[in-house]
Amino acid sequence: MVSGHSLSRRTMLGGVFALSAASTARAQDLTKASIALLRLSSSGPIFIAQEKGWFKEAGLDLTLKDFQAAAQVPLAVVSGDADLGVTAFTAGFFNLAAKGGLVVVAAQSAERPGYQLNVIAVTNAAWDAGVRSVKDLAGKRVAVTTVGSSVHYSLEVVAKKHGVDTKSLTIVALQTIPNMVAAFKGGQVDAAVFPITTFRQVEAEGSGKPIAYVGDEVPWQLGAVFTSPKTIADRRPLVEKFLVGYRRGAAAYHEAFGKRENGKLVPGPNYEEMIGILSSVLKQPPALVAAGLPFIDPDGRLDVGDIYKQVAFWQSTGQVARDADPKAFIDLSFVQGHFNVPGK
């Protein structure tokens, strides 16, 4: 005779094993994928979706691969080290894409009014000498990370808006943000284009003054989600599953951080949870994270025409091949409702 206690225990254990088997089966059903990225707030939708389990709900077992420099991210996708990538546009990115190595599928961050993401700042000495606006930069030494970078592009488009020919500037490429900070504080340059979180630390030390916030001056499509043509051809469902999770993350990010009034962030209803996730992932205090949150479209929609504009600019400087055609490396089929699509 089997006691009620033994039966209930067996039933319970059977249920546990069944749940475990079901979980294992679900895990085996997940598509394995990897994404190359920088551990910055602009990757926020990915961190949020990963933390909330939204990629798994979409059927994806996603591995995040961290890199230290933007140039490394598209190279990881081209080489096959990662299935997907997300980072800022650069001249190097467009050259890789033009050679058939990359396809843009959705938006990442963008410069927009009210989002103090990147800033053109001047040293105290330059300020005291009368450099108080972008127009005053003519003839000055301005630090950027690398020639062809998104930082360099920011300087170019803001200078153009104010009628400053960048040929009149001495653009000093210093490779890294710490090198830029050292040159700025040491007086080797008169100005620099800094990420806002870096500049706030410089400013707090009394070492510089802001003269222009890039997003307020010239809104532009800063970055994108991309993959390889081979991944789209052979594993399209992988990209589709990723974008389901990514867009959930982007929507949650936008709900928390997407409202601005008079250039100031107005926290959304899920702000505390989202800033907590990003603070933990980025290993930064919430206040510092909040100071550098970019605009990210909640649906992953691109400003397509602006990408064409960027390619044309880099072509005019000789840094991107003349035969590079954005239409060939932007796939509009994964996300609906992209903005400013040429020919529409």
Regions found by a protein language model. Give the residues of each.
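Short, glycine-/small- and polar/acidic-enriched structural segments
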Residues: 28-164, 171-174, 190-196, 213, ...
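Secondary-structure end/capping motifs
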Residues: 233-321
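Sec/Tat signal peptide C-region and signal peptidase I cleavage site
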Residues: 23-27
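N-terminal secretory signal peptides and thylakoid transit peptides that target proteins
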Residues: 2-19
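Short helix-loop capping/hinge motifs at secondary-structure junctions, enriched
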Residues: 125-133, 230-239
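Periplasmic-binding protein-like
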Residues: 110-119, 203-231, 235, 243-246, ...
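Conserved C-terminal helix/tail region of periplasmic/extracytoplasmic solute-binding proteins
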Residues: 307-344
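Short, hydrophobic alpha-helical packing/hinge segments within bilobed ligand-binding/sensory domains
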Residues: 73-76, 91-92, 179-183, 199, ...
